Amino acid sequence: MNKYYPTYLQTFVLFLIFIPCILISVLLVLPFASIENGIGLSLISIISMLLTVTAGLALRKDWRLKISLFPLAIIFLSVLFIIGLHILLDPLNEIFPAPESLIKVFRALLLQPYAAFFYIVISAPILEEVLFRGIILDGYLKNYKPWQGIIVSAFLFALIHGNLAQGLGAFGIGILFGWVYWKTNSIIPSIILHFINNAVAFVGMLTTPEEDINKSIREFMDNNFAFSMLYAFSIIIAVGSIWILHKKYLSKMSVERAEPKEELTIDT
């Protein structure tokens, strides 16, 4: 039985392709920029991801991406959930702080804020969404049960961040993005949400003193009672936004194209 690209095994091969893509991007960038500054790091990340996305689309033999109209309320409710999720994960961020290697990368990026902005806020959301939702999840939705594909693709999305501090949030957000992609049949909502999430993170990086970059929200507030109230409110926000998102919007959208079928073919 023919299947859509990619299957789980084909995704593993695609991740192996990512390794030489990194090496190629380093060789291309080194003559013009150091890999220790923001411009060099940004260029290497962008080129390696672009090469991987190109390989994925070529192997799929279909360069089209899903684009459909969707209610803007989906963006608003999803942003509320993301805010609530980040607050709910704050205690775990205290237990698993960002590694020093990641802090060094952030410092290098912020030395060239314009390059960092283009990489973090513009290119990363587009390229990562095309790879993880437009290619990987799109294949999973056609080959496997929807929620199985969403969870596996979210795990891979978390894994590529390379550390537990970012991975926890990336997994939760990856599930949200995958759910929205499945129901809306469009890659645009997840790209917009990724833009917003990364833009907020970028502003936080710029405005936070270097010595405080690993501080949790609770440590910034320095008031356990106030943080407890905020934490309780974030539960209400996260649960409420997801409930409304499901009941009023996503549950009413057609998912016919994402259901597993007996026979699947690849467009050529």
Give the residues covered by each predicted segment.
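Alpha-helical transmembrane segments
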Residues: T7-I22, I74-L85, V152, I235
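N-terminal membrane topogenic signal
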Residues: M1-F15, F225-M229
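Functionally important transmembrane alpha-helices
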Residues: Q166-D222
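Membrane-interface helix/loop boundary segments of multi-pass membrane proteins
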Residues: L127-V152, W179-S186
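C-terminal membrane module of polytopic membrane proteins
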Residues: N197-T268
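Juxtamembrane helix-loop-helix connectors linking adjacent transmembrane helices
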Residues: E36-I39, K61-I126, V130, D138, ...
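Alpha-helical transmembrane segments in multi-pass membrane proteins
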Residues: F12-A58, A232
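Hydrophobic residues within alpha-helical transmembrane segments
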Residues: V13, S123, V152-L156, L168, ...
